[in-house]
A protein has these predicted regions:
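Glycine/proline-enriched, intrinsically flexible loops and inter-domain linkers
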Residues: 1-213
Length: 213
């Protein structure tokens, strides 16, 4: 079995429906990167006061996004938890519909880890790196904007569930055919952070910093 837990609260704050779909899709990507196929999920919904119309809308749209995502990956929600009224005098927390998804690895030989294995191996990027129509080139709702520019703004990446499902199926096929030694999903921090994380091996951690240029 494999387990993934994901949610980008900033993306959900800016677009609850797309952000919630993306949380499900990221779980499925992480499972695929481990060599697993999704079989079920559970949620942990953390929101503010639902009597506030805007916050209730966040909850409603998030649940709609989770439902579409789980249906797309055939990962039914078997249970969950809801926590409301999460706020202080300054306002409510960012809506955080955290998803946990479990997957099945049919053959132990297909268990896949994230780090690079051998010098000279080819690095392949599956999927489009950024939406060509995005004026912020993928930076909408990013930690870059929030930390360096103190802005919670922009349009987070759109989540095409059909594309995500195809990506997962393709990756699993590559893993099961023995063509992939390691896999890691590209999420918070973008490609640079993903590549850096792929350098961290539990076996050779002391040697990996030299790979980071």
């Amino acid at each position: 079995l494999a387990l993934a837990v994901d949610c980008n609260a900033m993306h959900v704050y800016l677009d609850p429906f797309e952000g919630a779909k993306a949380a499900v899709a990221e779980c499925a990507r992480n499972l695929a990167c481990s060599g697993a196929t999704p079989i079920g999920s559970t949620d942990n919904l953390n929101f503010g006061n639902p009597h506030n119309p805007e916050l209730f809308w966040q909850l409603k749209e998030s649940v709609r996004g989770l439902a579409e995502g789980c249906a797309a990956f055939a990962a039914p929600v078997t249970g969950g938890n809801v926590s409301l009224y999460n706020q202080n005098p300054e306002g409510a927390i960012d809506p955080t519909p955290t998803m946990a998804m479990v997957g099945l690895i049919e053959d132990a030989a297909h268990v896949t880890t994230q780090w690079f294995k051998d010098e000279g191996d080819v690095i392949i990027l599956l999927g489009e790196p950024v939406d060509a129509e995005d004026a912020l080139h993928g930076l909408g709702g990013s930690a870059f904007l929030q930390v360096l520019h103190e802005q919670k703004t922009g349009t987070p990446p759109r989540c095409n569930l059909e594309t995500e499902r195809t990506l997962g199926t393709t990756l699993l096929g590559l893993i099961q055919s023995g063509l992939v030694k390691g896999a890691h999903d590209c999420a918070e921090g973008g490609l640079a952070v993903t590549l850096a994380e792929c350098c961290f091996s539990e076996l050779e951690g002391r040697n990996t910093p030299r790979f980071i240029g």
